[in-house]
Regions:
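Residue-level detector of beta-strand structural context in well-folded domains
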Residues: 2-3, 25
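Short, isolated positions in well-ordered beta-strands
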Residues: 12-14, 71
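Acidic, low-complexity, intrinsically disordered interaction modules
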Residues: 15-63
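Short intrinsically disordered terminal tails
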Residues: 1-2, 73-81
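Well-ordered beta-strand positions
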Residues: 5-6, 17
Length: 81
């Protein structure tokens, strides 16, 4: 599922959290750790992500491909509902 996406103007990686398999948006730049709903999730200083379950439907709708095309988040929604 690893895919580069845009969310709030930032390039993040749509992936699954290694410990639980939950879908999340993983940082690609250390400066992204200050984004709303970003959580420290690991032992290494660069392990931060936003879990999709913590985003509202409207916030999830803001996740797009790198060219701005909205993503079909159906599979990820099924994992978090």
């Amino acid at each position: 599922m690893d895919q580069n996406v845009l969310y709030r103007g930032q390039r993040l990686t749509l992936t699954r959290f290694w410990a639980t398999g939950e879908p999340c948006l993983w940082i690609t730049d250390p400066e992204q750790i200050g984004m709303p709903k970003m959580e420290f999730v690991g032992g290494h200083p660069d392990e931060y992500c936003i879990f999709l379950k913590n985003l509202t439907e409207a916030e999830r709708a803001q996740i797009t491909s790198l060219d701005g095309t909205p993503l079909d988040m159906k599979e990820e929604r099924n994992d978090i509902e």
